[in-house]
Amino acid sequence: MVTRSLADVVRSTDNLAEAFRETDVERGNVHFSVYPDEYTNWIEEQRAWSETCILMDQSYHLANFYIEGPDALTVNADLGIRDFEALRGQRAPQAKTHPIPNPDGYLVGDPVLFYLGEEEVVVTGNRGLGQKWIQYHVETGDYDAEVTDIYSPYGEDPPLEFRFEVQGPNAEAVMAEVFDGPLPDISFFQMTTATIDGHDVYVLGHGMASAPGFEVFGPYEHHDEIKALIHEAGAEHGLRELGGRAYKTTPVATGWLPPGLPAVYDHEDMQGYREWLSADRVEANWSLGGSFESDDITDYYVDLVALGHGRFIDFDHEFVGRDALAERIDDPERRKVTFLWDDEDVVDVFASLFGDGALHKFPKFPDLFQQWDLGHFDRIEIDGDVVGVSMYSCYDVNFRGVLSLGVIDTEYAAEGTEVTLVWGEENSPKRTVESHVEKEIEATVAPAPYVTAREDL
């Protein structure tokens, strides 16, 4: 039996961007299909991360790849902007963000690399986009390493590890009761080990939105026991567990912009990867949406420098995409920003549901778009000219408004710039998109992350 590949999918269509714009998302966002929409209600779950604390069970929606062997660090350094070879001989564990560019410097994926030992790393991230690119190089290149896909949200096997995140003003008080010993003294993105009820766990300092936080992970067999201990300790501190609806809104205030489309579909140096990658993978079944339309698939790619990863690039080592990124590191065409939507214009969208007149695209709160696409691109305009795209939008009760992350031409990236965001997807062939008329929404440019006190990675 011949298995279809991503390359077969690309060859089978004359216009890949159009094909992805016509693709429906089945069962909503698969990452969160294992979670209830709400454990209590999404408004109080949102409030908790700024007023008390939250528990996020990350055991099921992230792809986790173990890479073991003498070249475990080498292959990641060859493909990522960080020189992971520098970790050799250093203490473990450590964690580093791991933005991975294509040969032109556009984002393939942005997982996190956990350094557990000189020949052992775990790469964890969204949909496995960067991890599959790494796996391809390990399997086809001259690397003394082995990749094990220990868990995929698209597979049938249960995870081998649990992963919990506790965030918010009361997170330290909760976790002080959960850890067997003293509260780990680690800052943002530092790691250590600890025990919980006698079980060994890894601990990552992962405060977000100006509040303290911890990420703990270990063998999945202890999932239920440790989760119960966190809930027990959190009861008197206002802890709430996040359901899928509130969870999907967490990236916006903290400034993490997921890939709207992995940059893997066009470059000739990635043809071998496209032939290797199965057509069952999400890359071959992507869904694009929003008011921005282009027939050029590369117009949906996003530059690593525009996303703010430039400060992490180590140009002293060779890696895929190095030359392209070096050319624009000092003069990026676009920058990541937050767009603050005008309240009255948002109310007008809902008001169109009543009375006469055309309907506007219904924004199901709190995450506005993920019911009908995987990568969202709404036009950002000034005087009718497209100057950027809004890519990830939500309502956040902590700000009492709608805000979104996106990228905008550098000359318009200053805080306070007034822009027009075009909301909707007129004449969409998707079954999940109702007939509607696009709506112009006034918006204001703000920093990303919007909660500016967040510490650097």
Task: Annotate the PLM regions.
Residues D57, P103-G105, Q370-W372:
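A short catalytic or substrate-binding loop motif that flags glycine-/basic-rich loops and adjacent residues
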